[in-house]
Structures are given as structure tokens and as C-alpha cells.
């Protein structure tokens, strides 16, 4: 296939390489308490994503990403917490948000298991990454002499998440942090497709984890307990 016959595709390819899958991100924080009442200890924080049978849930890999991005050993793995609290955090019975937690914690068995685990702070993550737009086309052929793909495809994705920090002991919301990232990915192809990916979910994870680190590092007040 003669590339000179397709200047439009070559121009789009050059544009895609120049843009390089750019991502724009926004982080916002609303603090409803001046500071944590008690500094986080080992295993005293759990990060949970929304899970429910209605098909809407926060991706487990995003929750894992945030947990692993937080420095230190204060974070209890989500899976370990869910297993210890079985069956109350399974998809069919899990709370839909922090507003449902007081009712759940009124159950003495639930409260005791959480206390035994030593978990003080719950970070509830709600949100998802979605494809918002896509355009272009690509055609691939296979022949005895070889094959290849020709075309240009773009797609835009938006990663939007909100983390609510909840004190399980005082049963109050300490603050909320939102992380939004959006970007456009490109896949030009002249024989071989070359994906140029905008990693919006990774950017949203990094921004949310960094802000949570700052939030959780705020000096604890003296009236801890």
C-alpha cells in the first residue's frame, strides 16, 4: 500500500504521536473535620469500592491501585476485610454508601468484628471509568502475500471517583476527595496498529492516592480515642 496516497492518515498519525494520549486531571477536597481524632495505625484503614448486584460497581483494580499507592502499612487489604465481615459486605448485602453504615454498625456482630480487626477509618470509593466518545474506523485484511490494518481510531475516556473518609468509631464523615481524569486515546494504523493510550484511570488513582495521603497525614487532635 502506497503511503503517499493517504496524506490524511499520515497527518492524523503525526498528530496522534504529538498529542501522545494526553490526560487532564482535577482533584478536589472537602474536609468536614479539622483533623483525624487518632493517627492511623497498622491495618487501621480499609479502602472499599461500591459493590452491588445492580451492575454498578467501582472497579476492584482501581481500589487496589489506591490502596497500594498509599505509603505505609496502615491499609488493610479490601479482600481481607470483606472475608472477615462475611456476609455483610458481599454484593447482595453491601451498603450502597456511607449513609448506610450507621445501620450496619448497629449490628453488634458487625461492630465487634470491625473492632477485632482494629479498623478505625473506612475510605469508601464510588465511581467508574467510562468511554464517552469514539470516532474513526479501521480495516484489516489478510492475504497470501501478507496482511495489515489501515485507518485511524480515537476514543475518549473519563475516570470519575469520589472517596469518602469515614470514622467508624465516632460514626462521622471526616471529608470527601474527588478525582476526575479525562483524555483521548489514538490508534493509527498503516499495516500495524499503534495504540497511543491516555491512561485516565491510572492518573485518577495517582491523584486520589496522593490527596488521601495528605488528608491522612494531617496531625491528629489531642483528644484521641
Where are these regions (language model features)?
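Bacterial N-terminal signal peptides that target proteins for export
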Residues: 2-12
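Bacterial N-terminal signal peptides
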Residues: 11-21
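Structured loop/turn residues at beta-strand edges in well-structured enzyme cores
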Residues: 17, 40, 117-120
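Solvent-exposed, acidic/flexible segments
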Residues: 55-63, 99, 103-107, 154, ...
Amino acid at each position: 500500500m502506497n503511503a503517499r496516497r493517504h496524506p490524511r492518515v499520515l497527518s492524523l498519525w503525526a498528530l496522534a504521536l504529538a498529542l501522545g494520549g494526553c490526560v487532564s486531571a482535577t482533584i478536589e477536597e472537602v474536609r468536614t473535620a479539622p483533623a483525624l481524632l487518632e493517627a492511623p495505625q497498622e491495618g487501621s484503614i480499609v479502602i472499599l469500592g461500591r459493590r452491588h448486584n445492580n451492575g454498578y460497581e467501582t472497579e476492584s483494580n482501581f481500589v487496589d491501585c489506591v490502596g497500594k499507592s498509599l505509603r505505609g502499612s496502615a491499609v488493610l487489604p479490601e479482600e481481607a476485610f470483606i472475608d472477615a465481615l462475611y456476609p455483610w459486605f458481599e454484593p447482595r448485602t453491601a451498603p450502597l454508601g456511607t449513609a448506610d453504615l450507621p445501620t450496619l454498625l448497629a449490628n453488634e456482630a458487625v461492630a465487634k468484628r470491625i473492632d477485632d480487626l482494629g479498623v478505625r477509618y473506612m475510605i469508601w470509593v464510588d465511581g467508574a471509568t467510562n468511554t464517552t466518545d469514539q470516532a474513526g474506523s479501521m480495516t484489516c485484511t489478510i492475504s497470501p502475500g501478507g496482511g495489515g490494518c489501515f485507518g485511524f481510531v480515537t476514543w475518549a475516556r473519563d475516570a470519575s471517583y469520589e472517596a469518602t473518609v469515614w470514622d467508624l468509631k465516632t460514626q462521622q464523615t471526616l471529608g470527601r476527595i474527588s478525582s476526575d481524569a479525562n483524555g483521548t486515546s489514538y490508534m493509527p494504523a498503516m499495516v500495524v496498529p499503534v495504540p497511543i493510550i491516555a491512561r485516565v484511570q491510572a492518573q485518577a488513582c495517582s491523584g486520589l492516592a496522593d490527596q488521601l495521603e495528605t488528608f491522612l497525614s494531617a496531625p491528629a487532635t489531642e483528644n484521641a480515642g
